[in-house]
Structures are given as structure tokens and as C-alpha cells.
Amino acid sequence: MRHRKSGRQLNRNSSHRQAMFRNMASSLVRHEIIKTTAVKAKELRRVVEPLITLAKSDSVANRRLAFARTRDQEVVGKLFNELGPRYQERPGGYTRILKCGLRAGDKAPMAYIELVGRPEAAQAVEVEAAE
């Protein structure tokens, strides 16, 4: 019985799942929008939102915790220097999931996951790239 077991397995073992979400979280922080399957996007929220909450209070201990979870110093820098101050007044809900149809190969539902309130210049570039 799987009572009280939260999170989706996604047909992967635990180390693969952990590595995948670590990479996806780093990509989302770096680019502020990524395209993935809808199910992975929903799971990714559970990884990224606590990282941003951690970045709202800058300390050496919090930076080390963020590094332990992402293993990427560049991502930790962006979290604490840009995203933490940007979301200082927001009490959660830092990501938005936008459904974008089905993948051509296997009809998997796809979605964009983006950080709320990302700069307008980046949004304009993404729209042009999509067209």
C-alpha cells in the first residue's frame, strides 16, 4: 500500500529522479522558463519553491543548503542575488505552469513552467522564439 507516500515516481529510480529534478531546477533558475511535461512541471514546483523561499533570507547556512540541493554555484548566486530579493514580499507561489499542447512523438501533455514576475525583456524573447 502506498499510504502517505507523496511525490510521483515518474518510472525512474530515486537517484535518477533526484538528479533529473536537480538539473531541471537549475535550468529553471538559470533561464526562468523551461518546457517539460505537465507532470514533471507539477513535481518541479515542489523542488523550486522551497529553494526560492530559502533564498529570501541570505545567510551562509542557507547558501550551503541551496548548494547541497542544486550542486551549482552559479544557480546559488542567482537565487540569492536576484530571485530572493525579487520575491521578498511574495509569500509563496513563485512559479506558473502554462499548458502548451501535446508532444509530437508520444502525445504527452507539455507545459511551460516559469517564474512569476520575470523581466519583460526575457518574456518578449521567449514569445519570438516560440513563433
Curated annotation (Swiss-Prot):
SUPFAM superfamilies: Prokaryotic ribosomal protein L17 (SSF64263). Part of the 50S ribosomal subunit. Contacts protein L32. Keywords: Ribonucleoprotein, Ribosomal protein. PANTHER family: LARGE RIBOSOMAL SUBUNIT PROTEIN BL17M (PTHR14413:SF16), RIBOSOMAL PROTEIN L17 (PTHR14413). Belongs to the bacterial ribosomal protein bL17 family. One of its GO terms (cellular component) is cytosolic large ribosomal subunit. It comes from Shewanella amazonensis (strain ATCC BAA-1098 / SB2B). Gene3D superfamilies: Ribosomal protein L17. This is Large ribosomal subunit protein bL17. The keyword Nucleotidyltransferase does not apply. InterPro entries: Ribosomal_bL17, Ribosomal_bL17_CS, Ribosomal_bL17_sf. GO terms for biological process: translation. One of its GO terms (molecular function) is structural constituent of ribosome. Disulfide bonds: none annotated. It comes from the Bacteria. The keyword Ribosomal protein applies.
